[in-house]
């Protein structure tokens, strides 16, 4: 078992073994995010699903109102005049079969891959290299589309794809320590609503198991999911 650093041990002792109201949890996370860089704020959510069954898989996108605070590198595989459109829209990598070959040889210098439908037969051959990294374009995730300019703009602005892993856990980076508590809360609330809205049809029993937030170098804090779901903004 990995030994905790003195810093982590000291920070962890301040956190009680209970669930916290969302804003209280975020305040603690921000207070503990005192590294010498702008730490990323993450959510780790265990759901009551078994993704080995197709009707219990969760994979979708969410547009966080305040973005993620991170810049992402986007690659686009398309053809014809769409290559120029991808370039002008801000894609970091773009191309046709040449980009397919480059990726097949191991060039994975991007965070997101978008493809137009006409190129998917060629992209499908990259399953061996894209699949394990979760980079295979998917219509449900908005990464297989004919409107590549809009897709690039949305993902650059903070739209992100997320999925439940094999254990039914969702890992999402939803902001930076420099964000205000309210901005982090609004991002977190949007994420929660998206997970509820996209609940797999085969999910049985208790859907939300545990919900933790943490920073890059800090301890995790458990969030009261019911309080997050029940929150209503003041009119």
From Swiss-Prot:
The gene is rplA. SUPFAM superfamilies: Ribosomal protein L1. Keywords: Repressor, Ribonucleoprotein, Ribosomal protein, RNA-binding, rRNA-binding, Translation regulation, tRNA-binding. Part of the 50S ribosomal subunit. GO terms for biological process: regulation of translation; translation. GO terms for molecular function: rRNA binding; structural constituent of ribosome; tRNA binding. It comes from Prochlorococcus marinus (strain MIT 9515). Pfam families: Ribosomal_L1. CDD domains: Ribosomal_L1 (cd00403). It comes from the Bacteria. The lineage of its organism: Bacteria, Bacillati, Cyanobacteriota, Cyanophyceae, Synechococcales. Belongs to the universal ribosomal protein uL1 family. This is Large ribosomal subunit protein uL1. GO terms for cellular component: large ribosomal subunit. Binds directly to 23S rRNA. The L1 stalk is quite mobile in the ribosome, and is involved in E site tRNA release. Protein L1 is also a translational repressor protein, it controls the translation of the L11 operon by binding to its mRNA. PANTHER family: 54S RIBOSOMAL PROTEIN L1, MITOCHONDRIAL, LARGE RIBOSOMAL SUBUNIT PROTEIN UL1M.
């Amino acid at each position: 078992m990995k030994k905790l650093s003195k810093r982590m041990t000291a920070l962890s002792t301040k956190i009680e073994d209970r669930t916290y109201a969302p804003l209280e949890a975020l305040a603690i996370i921000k207070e503990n995010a005192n590294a010498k860089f702008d730490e990323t704020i993450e959510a780790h959510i265990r759901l009551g699903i078994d993704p080995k069954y197709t009707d219990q898989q969760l994979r979708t996108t969410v547009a966080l109102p305040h973005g993620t605070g991170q810049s992402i590198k986007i690659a686009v595989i398309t053809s014809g005049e769409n290559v120029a459109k991808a370039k002008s829209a801000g894609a970091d990598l773009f191309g046709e079969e040449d980009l397919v070959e480059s990726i097949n040889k191991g060039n994975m210098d991007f965070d997101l891959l978008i493809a137009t439908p006409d190129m998917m037969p060629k992209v499908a051959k990259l399953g061996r290299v894209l699949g394990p990294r979760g980079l295979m374009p998917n219509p449900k995730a908005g990464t297989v589309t004919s409107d590549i300019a809009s897709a690039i703009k949305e993902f650059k602005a903070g739209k992100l794809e997320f999925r439940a892993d094999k254990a039914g856990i969702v890992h999402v980076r939803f902001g930076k320590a420099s964000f205000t508590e309210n901005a982090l809360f609004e991002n977190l609330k949007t994420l929660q609503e998206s997970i509820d809205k996209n609940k797999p049809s085969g999910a049985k029993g208790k859907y939300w198991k545990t919900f933790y937030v943490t920073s890059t170098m800090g301890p995790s804090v458990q969030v009261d999911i019911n309080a997050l779901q029940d929150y209503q903004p003041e009119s």
